[in-house]
Amino acid sequence: MLAEVAGCVIIERIAKFARYTNLGDRRQVMLIGFSVGNYKSFKETVTLSLVASSITEEDKELDENNVFPINDKLSLLKSAAIYGANASGKSNIVAAINFMKWFVLNSSKETQVSEAIDIEAFRLSTETEKEPSFFEIVFLLEDKTFRYGFEVNAREVVSEWLFQSDDSEEKMLFERDFDNYILDDFPEGQGIIDKTRSNALFLSVVAQFNGKISGKILRWFSKTLQLISGLEDREYRKQTLESLENAGHRHDIIEFIKKLDLGILGIDEIKINIPPPVFFISNNTEKYGGSYGNLYPNSETKTTVHVHTLHPKYDADGKQTSKVLFDIEKHESEGTNKLFALAGLLLDTLRTGKILFIDELDARLHPLITRELICLFNSNETNPHNAQLIFTTHDTNLLSSKTFRKDQIWFTEKDNKGATDLYSLVEYKVGKDASLERDYIMGKYGAIPFIGNFKELIGELHE
């Protein structure tokens, strides 16, 4: 176990180089909570809440850095960690919000006209297998709180709703029950009902017709809400490469890599233009007049980027004599490749105050580095725009490092019928001197695997 250490090692050094855009008050684009029910392993509706509870921590820095106030009634958390055994449903939280984002952005497209909705209800109960799946998200946008959700099955949108509130009470903008709509205070939706298919979201269709509120909400889903897998570097490596084109962002990325003590002095990219073949075989019947399999001139040149890291080379006296280029994919570790891929996205999220979900954040990373990445978010200095990080993890060292408040720690656990529950550590009475890591490993909070007797298995194999 790591020693219990308050604070982060490289926070001060990171803060010195980070260039944050002056975006004003970024509190108004934050996530408040997300709920899902009857989806994958979630039979009942569960809620992941980023609302800070009324608890106070013994370490006051956690309260000062990990929480930001919105108003007198609401404070939000800058990060949340989700723990659980393998196959307990941790990743399904990320999958659920990823589906919601995808459906909001794509359901109204013509390509989805005749397509079934790719939804997976909880399959281990006769009660739910034919019922719709439930999704709801609550978020801040331009000083207003929006609560948007829908129920959907493979054929159609069963219900949909949008509510808005500011300092006053919550008011309904619209509600939908199959093909029945109520538009109380949503003028941009007038005349759009007949244009909304049964398998498309009303909000998405209204946004296509330049609805002001709906357009802002879709941009929030598209630009502010980000989701990635910590196991698939290729998904987000492109953003780091694009960020290297900006001089300021390039400096930040290189400094970020250097501060993590990876033995890297710098980054160099080599762009190679791959000449096209003189001809190619067409399989695009519309573009090429209905022909198929004919040869056509090809003028498209493809560019590939090879990233190299710079390492110092020393003589026998330990004096640096030169620098050596390493191909990052061939010569660097999986962890270094992941950190390079993450760098652009992490720094952009902090720079612009976005929301980032990462499934398996700690995969291929040293526990100390994982902690440092989290500390970048749990800091007023390096996270002045109140970006939010929500991630799944197996790294129990984080529980001993005084990194989180109790309301930032979440668990997933399956019952004996295969249904996942999601709950927070704040629901438990935890003593001031309690070792969260030890108590979690010992099963005090649940969400651990129940492992069978392997000795019996080995004995059977030898019989």
Predicted segment positions?
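Electropositive, glycine-dotted interaction segments
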Residues: 146-285
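Coil-to-beta-strand transition motifs
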Residues: 43, 130-132, 143-145, 154-158, ...
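Short, surface-exposed charged micro-motifs
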Residues: 47, 136, 147-151, 173, ...
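Extended helical coiled-coil dimerization/tether regions that scaffold
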Residues: 37, 235-331, 454-455, 460
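Conserved P-loop NTP-binding catalytic core
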Residues: 65-81, 85, 94-148, 153-154
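Switch/communication elements of ASCE P-loop NTPase nucleotide-binding domains
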Residues: 7-71, 75-105, 316-450
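Short polybasic amphipathic segments
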Residues: 34, 135-137, 157-164, 305-315, ...
